[in-house]
């Protein structure tokens, strides 16, 4: 996920089974720049709650019966399934991706609508609707340090409680940001 359209990334525990496996959820502002984003997986109630906080349209591939109440909420906007299928050599559940415009899988000879077509054929707007609550976060204009605080603690390594993949954030002094690690190694995007 390149910096071109990255907005907010959540790592969410999807199940208390399977060693508390996690999935990523990305909130994208500049969705009209998406060439390929995914893979798209099934949703849980948490995905609907977070999408509503951002006044976003949730893109997912269905889910268990207990998401039905969330799909039915007035503020819930979502596109379920039918996204582009890429022939990438992976299992079927890892081949579904969001695109902005139509995509044709030349190996299968099938064309899939992108977000552009899906919005045009839906009741959803591409601008904020009546449920928009305003800006989500407020960040400092400049760097904030706690060097002058005697009670400050070091936060160079943050271990998140996800046993399955051992998610860890490690502070990178060169960039002044945290790098994400899982399974003991730095996680790199395709653009990295």
Task: Describe the function of each predicted region.
Residues 2-6, 10, 15-192:
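A surface/extracellular/periplasmic glyco- and lipid-processing/surface-interacting theme
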């Amino acid at each position: 996920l390149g910096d071109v359209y990255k907005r907010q990334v959540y790592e969410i525990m999807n199940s208390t089974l399977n060693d508390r496996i996690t999935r990523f959820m990305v909130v994208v502002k500049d969705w009209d720049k998406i060439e390929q984003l995914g893979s798209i997986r099934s949703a849980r109630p948490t995905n609907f709650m977070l999408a509503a906080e951002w006044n976003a349209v949730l893109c997912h591939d269905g889910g268990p019966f207990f998401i039905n109440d969330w799909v039915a909420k007035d503020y819930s906007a979502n596109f379920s399934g039918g996204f582009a299928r890429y022939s990438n050599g992976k299992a079927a559940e890892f081949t579904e991706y969001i695109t902005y415009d139509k995509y044709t899988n030349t190996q299968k000879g099938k064309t899939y609508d992108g977000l552009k077509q899906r919005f045009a054929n839906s009741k959803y707007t591409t601008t904020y609707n009546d449920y928009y609550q305003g800006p989500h976060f407020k960040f400092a204009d400049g760097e904030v340090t706690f060097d002058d605080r005697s009670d400050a603690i070091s936060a160079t390594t943050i271990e998140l409680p996800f046993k399955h993949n051992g998610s860890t954030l490690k502070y990178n002094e060169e960039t002044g940001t945290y790098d994400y690690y899982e399974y003991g190694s730095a996680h790199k995007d395709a653009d990295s």
